[in-house]
Design a protein with these regions (language model features):
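Electropositive polyanion-binding surfaces
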Residues: 1-177
């Protein structure tokens, strides 16, 4: 499976390479399969992206890799090792949304106000470039101390997440914790 992105693929996708993007995962994670992006569009209007590695670009339906992944259904995380659903080169390198590497993604993009009102949304194929990898602990420390790399972006995402969570509970969502 070639790791290079064909030139014609860029033309088919929305370009998010210059949008602030980062991953937040466990400290021992190797496969960064999702990322968040955020940019201010204008006063009180933000564009938030949830990006998932586009494995379908590399694994065609019905292929040997696809059939094996379907059998496995998920990666298995054991204490001493991981049994990946996909070949290691694919999940830990080609499709891993590692910092400073251009990657293909399938993305949900939301335009929302500071009050969490979603004004527009779309699901699109994108090309992204993650700016940084955070562990859960690093992101939490930025939220608590309001200091660190990309603090404005992380704090805005945290604020929007809390507003959206409150709206869900007000609308009747159940918390199972």
């Amino acid at each position: 499976i070639p790791a290079e992105i064909p030139a014609e693929e860029y033309a088919k996708r929305e370009d998010f390479r210059n949008v602030t993007t980062f991953t937040i995962d466990p400290k021992d994670a190797k496969d960064f399969d999702d990322a968040l992006s955020i940019r201010k569009l204008k006063d009180n209007l933000w564009e938030v992206g949830v990006h998932i590695a586009d494995v379908t670009h590399y694994v065609t339906e019905g292929s040997i890799i696809d059939k094996e992944a379907e059998k496995r259904a998920t990666s298995v995380y054991l204490v001493d090792r991981t049994i990946p659903m996909l070949p290691e080169r694919l999940c830990n390198f080609i499709c891993s949304l590692r910092p400073d590497e251009e990657k293909l993604a399938y993305s949900a993009i939301f335009e929302m106000t500071d009050k969490g009102e979603v004004k527009n949304s779309r699901i699109v194929h994108t090309v992204i470039k993650s700016d940084r990898r955070f562990t859960y602990e690093e992101a939490q420390q930025i939220i608590e101390t309001k200091e660190g790399d990309f603090k404005e972006e992380i704090l805005k995402l945290d604020s929007l997440a809390k507003i959206l969570r409150e709206k869900r509970f007000t609308a009747g969502a159940i918390n199972f914790d």
